[in-house]
């Protein structure tokens, strides 16, 4: 049966744009896959451990020789790995924080990128090869060509490389821009741009989930 892994990372439990678009994806997916399995992990409410020496050293130590700290770190990583390995489709929502991504997303990727197991280093070589990956991003402004802060987007480029390292060769980014136009007076003129961007993103998400 189809299995969707749904990852959220926004700190906001309500009103989050990235969560909203990801939920539109999940709702459409459930509608079109009534017998499927959906696993949801919220990295904001249950943050993964950041990479630490117990995990790094424990992964290089035979199981019977691991310290209790190493064994626990490896056990936690195994839970994340099994979630990724058992799914065959993924939707990940990622807001932009300070021109990048939440630290919980980096921590999660550090848990699941394991060379020789889930990662081969290039698209088509890794656990995500042949599986549909959809990344929902929300950005307070716009970093498109010609924008005042063109080149400041350190979110999408990194995430694309990270997921390709996991083998992703069917990946789509759905981005909502100008999310701060509702709260920042300096961006108020772009409210219509934001609303149109969000509406388009939600429809794109629904359509991709149904495909």
From Swiss-Prot:
Q: Residue span of the signal peptide, if any?
A: none
Tell me yes or no: is Membrane among this UniProt entry's keywords: no
Query: Which positions does UniProt annotate for FMN binding?
Result: 10, 16-18
Q: How is the cofactor bound?
A: Binds 1 FMN per subunit.
Domain of life according to the entry: Bacteria
Q: Which UniProt keywords apply?
A: Flavoprotein, FMN, NAD, Oxidoreductase
Note one Pfam family from the annotation. Answer: Flavodoxin_2
User: What is the reaction catalyzed?
Assistant: 2 a quinone + NADH + H(+) = 2 a 1,4-benzosemiquinone + NAD(+); N,N-dimethyl-1,4-phenylenediamine + anthranilate + 2 NAD(+) = 2-(4-dimethylaminophenyl)diazenylbenzoate + 2 NADH + 2 H(+)
Quaternary structure and partners: Homodimer.
Give the family, as the similarity comment puts it. Belongs to the azoreductase type 1 family.
> Under which name does UniProt file this protein?
FMN-dependent NADH:quinone oxidoreductase
């Amino acid at each position: 049966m189809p299995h969707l892994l749904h990852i959220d990372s926004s700190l906001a439990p309500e009103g989050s744009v990235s969560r909203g678009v990801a939920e539109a994806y999940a709702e459409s997916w459930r509608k079109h896959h009534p017998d499927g399995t959906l696993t949801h992990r919220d990295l904001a409410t249950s943050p993964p451990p950041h990479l630490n020496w117990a995990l790094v050293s424990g992964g290089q130590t035979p199981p019977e020789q691991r310290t209790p700290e190493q064994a626990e770190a490896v056990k936690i990583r195994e839970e994340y790995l099994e979630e990724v390995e058992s799914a065959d489709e993924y939707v990940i929502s990622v807001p932009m924080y300070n021109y990048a991504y939440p630290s919980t997303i980096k921590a999660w990727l550090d848990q699941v990128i394991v060379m020789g197991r889930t990662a081969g280093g290039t698209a088509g070589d890794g656990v995500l090869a042949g599986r549909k990956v959809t990344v929902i991003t929300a950005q307070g402004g716009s970093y498109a060509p010609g924008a005042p802060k063109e080149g400041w987007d350190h979110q999408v480029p990194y995430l694309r490389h990270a997921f390709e390292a996991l083998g992703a060769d069917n990946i789509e980014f759905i981005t909502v821009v100008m999310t701060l136009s509702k709260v920042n007076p300096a961006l108020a003129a772009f409210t219509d741009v934001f609303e149109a961007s969000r509406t388009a993103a939600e429809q794109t998400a629904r359509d991709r989930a149904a495909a």
